[in-house]
Structure formats: C-alpha cells, structure tokens
Amino acid sequence: MSGLDRESTRRSAKAGDLTLNYYEAGDPTPLGGGLPLVMLHGGGPGASAWSNFGSALPGFAEDFRTILIDQPGFGQSDKPPVVGNYFRFAAEAVKDLLDELAIDRIHLLGNSLGGGTAARFALLYPERVGRLVLMGPGGLNLSLFHADPTEGVKRLMDFGAAPSKEALRAFISTMVVNQDLVTDELVEERFADATAPGAQEAMLSMGMSFWNPDSYEDGLLWRDAHQLKRPTLLTWGREDRVNPLDGAFVALKMIPKASLHVFPNCGHWAQIEAAEEFRQVCTAYLARHVERTKETP
C-alpha cells in the first residue's frame, strides 16, 4: 500500500485520563479473521510507533487494519508519571484506547518494551486477543548465559546518565548487525525525540518502574508465562545484543502455544533489518495459524 506517510496516518484519541497518539492504515481482510493488528514499539531513547514500525506500515496495511500506538511516555502521546509497573500501566492505557475506538478483539504485536506491554495485555484481557507476536520481548526474556545487564541495556543506561548524540549512536549500534542502518539522519531524529520536553522525565519514570521494590516483581512476566493462553509467535534476531536469543527459551518452554522464529544476521530490530522476511513470517502466522494441543496431532 503506497502513499502512506506519517501525517496522513496520524490520529489521536482519549485513553482514560490520557491522550494517545497512533497511526492507522488499511482495512480488515479475511486474513487473521479480519481482526485489526496493533503494534507496540520498544522503549529506547527517542522510540515511537513511527520510528519502530512506520516503514513496516505499508506492507502490513495491505492485509490488516494496522494500528501503531505511541505508548504512554513516548512519541506524541501524553507523558504522565508511571503508576506501578510500566507494562501494566501501558497495557491498561492500550485497553482504554481500544475501548474509545470501539475495537473489541485484536492481534497484538510488540517489540521489546512493547512486547512486555503486549504480554501483560494478553494476561489481563485474554478474551480481547486473537494471536500474539512478541519480538525479543521485555519481561519474558530470561537470559540463561548472557550477563545482565546486556550490552544494549548498558548503552541505554549510559545515554540516560549523560544524553548525547554520541551516546545515542552507541546505543543504536547495538540494535542492528548492519551498521549502515545507523545513519546520521536516524541519530538526529531519535535524539530530537529523546530530548523533547518531558521525554527524559518519562523515560526515567518508565525505567524506575522496573527498579522500584513496589513494582519490580510485576514486571517479571516470565513468572506468568504459563498463563499466556493465546497462540504466540516469539521472534528473535540471532545477534540480538539487547535481549539475547538465549532469553527466548524459558518463554518458549512456558507459554503453552508458543512458536519461535529466529532471524539470522539480525539484531533487535527485525522489523527493520529483516523487513520483508519479518512481514512474511508474521502475516503467515496471523493468517494461517492452526491451533494444536498435546492431545491433537
């Protein structure tokens, strides 16, 4: 689907007490039962729905009504202090937005931080989710062999401590294998968003929700993975330096209806670095997935 740009697809709506920004394109088709596809971005500096998924929107909009949401604290959405753990806070905001848009059920795709939000949403509101696609998801990744924090998280913390374009470039470099994707234009765009009014305070509030003793354990989604009843596709870049591949195995074991697809020569941004393969894999899963249990061959 051509002719889609940031401004022509941009919308906003109330989500409880918040106003959330989102981008929408495409119409329902028989694929995936006609359910809308909602995408939730990651949580790095300057992250937004458009920066993560804008380039993927035309392809997915061919087959789905596709909605890219700026999560609370990111992009053009409101940036309130986080109450409790961010995954739950954002999942409830997504639910409020869907209520406002009169959308009952969705397929849900989340990247990194957005994967954690998507998983929490599916735990809270399983009846509203068709299928899940979780890309190197936060909260579910439990590294078996890599040190924690990982290289990517360390670079994220470096930027938070002393924001600069150099620190941001170092962080973005951990996102991808192909360093040609780390352009000056990308760094400038992400830095502008990361240092916009309220952005750094929102990032700090989000981050602290995973360290605060009162909300920390609510973010350990791997503990609840066995309760994720919806069909779930886990996707991972083999060279992911933020949430490394060994973090997939506990989730793969624990989620009852989980599958795993690994993109070779790919980092944390499969939707960008393996764009066409990512679209094909996700579309095939959402369109033709057949549920199979231990009792059925």
Language model segments and positions:
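Conserved HGGG/HGGXW glycine-rich cap/lid loop of the alpha/beta-hydrolase fold
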Residues: 18-76
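Active-site loop/oxyanion-hole signature of alpha/beta-hydrolase fold enzymes
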Residues: 23, 57-58, 68-109, 280-283
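Gly/Ala-rich beta-loop-alpha elbow adjacent to hydrolase catalytic centers
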Residues: 110, 114, 118
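Flexible "cap/lid" loop of the alpha/beta hydrolase fold
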Residues: 119, 123, 130-164
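Conserved alpha/beta-hydrolase catalytic His-Asp/Glu region
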Residues: 163-226
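Short beta-strand/loop motif that positions the catalytic acidic residue
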Residues: 228, 234-236
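Acidic catalytic loop of the alpha/beta-hydrolase fold
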Residues: 239-243
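Catalytic active-site module of serine/aspartate enzymes centered on a nucleophile-bearing elbow/loop
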Residues: 258-297
